[in-house]
Amino acid sequence: MNKYFVHQSSYIDDNTSIGEGTKIWHFCHILSGTKIGNNCVIGQNVMIGPDVIIGNNCKIQNNVSIYKGVILEDDVFCGPSCVFTNVINPRAFI
């Protein structure tokens, strides 16, 4: 028995790690190599990965996209429809 919840409409690729108490809601896609910590909430229609790391106790609202290689530390809140890319512009503060 899983110690996390994934709605039946979501897709979880092979080679992913999902922490205890995490909930993944409708129409999400979690790509290969992604690690999601404990007690996270992933809202509807979220795309994560590949090779993304999400810390513990994170809340990711509906329609968020998190692209390859992004790392979110513990206790991060992502508002609706935000997009995290893997492009870091010179002289940018992240």
Functional labels for PLM-detected ranges:
Residues 2-8, 14-16, 23-94:
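Flexible, glycine/small-residue-enriched loop-and-beta-strand segment within the central core
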